[in-house]
Amino acid sequence: MIYTITFNPALDYVIKMQNLKIGKINKSPKEYIYPGGKGINVSIVLKVLEQETTAMGFISGFVGEEIEKQVQKYGVKTDFIKIENDNSRINIKILEETQETAINAKGPYIEEKYIELLYKKLERIEDKDSLVLSGSVPNGISNNIYETICQKLKNKNIKIVVDSTGELLLKTLKYKPYLIKPNQQELEEIFNTKIVNKDQALEYAKKLQEKGAQNVIISMGSKGAVLLDENGYSYKINALNTKDAINTVGAGDSMVAGFLAGHEMFNNYEKALQMGVAAATATTNSIFLATKEKIEENLKNFK
């Protein structure tokens, strides 16, 4: 089982239009409503790839109830903690022909008693399961939370994936997470540097591996991605077709899901990376997240 935690889920209200006129009344030709949050995205794409997954995290109010219904609609099991007397957030995404605009709400305050409930749920995770920690954390949650979770689970044989940046990520490295996936910009911020090619990215991936990470993926947008695996082997992969890209939200999450599913299927890191890139590209060519058909079509580019 692959568990994901989304600390601040949302309903994403997506509006697709040709040209947003600021300060004017705009009429939308088409709207979509989807569940949002990095962990939720990972779980949905995992399920698309026929992997068993459970989405965890915090929801609140009628918006939270709708988030859970939407997630379950994709066949994902849920084990959310319900926050009283508040509401989960609604985010607005505006997709124009040449740009995207996002308005992300703050979300509910998470009291300590709910954090303790999460820790109790995590005790039920079994050896050989996986846990994905992704994204930022909302009000009320310390930026030590990922480190604390890793510490509590360190004596179990669990694959922990961390898809975050800054201190949230760096504090987990001493617990040797199975996989981390900073993107190029996040890697540059961590090391206060500028990265221009894949070889440079691999040099800094090695530094993260030396700090404890087992496998390091660096996603590099239109340049593709690189992987430094736990055995010291490196892989470089070019981006697939990006000319049809209409949406970047969830692409990184799809890469994580594709990699985990690919390694489960093939027990091969190169093929896992290919699956990750195929899934990420499929999401960029979709209004929401990747479909199995688009992922399989993209995989043909690697044969």
Label each PLM-derived region with a short phrase.
Residues K198-K303:
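Conserved phosphate-binding/catalytic region of the ribokinase-like
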Residues I83, I94-D127:
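Conserved phosphate-binding/catalytic loop of the ribokinase/pfkB sugar-kinase fold
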Residues I2, Q51-T54, T78-D79, I160, ...:
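Hydrophobic anchor at the start of a short beta-strand
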Residues A102-N104, K128-G135, D163, K181-E186:
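Short beta-strands and strand-loop turn motifs
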Residues K47, K154, E264:
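Gly/Ala-rich phosphate-binding loop of Rossmann-like dinucleotide-binding domains
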Residues K27-N87:
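Substrate-binding N-lobe of the ribokinase-like
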Residues M1-G23, Y32:
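Positively charged, low-complexity intrinsically disordered leader regions
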Residues E147-Y233:
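Conserved phosphate/ATP/ADP-binding segment of small-molecule kinases
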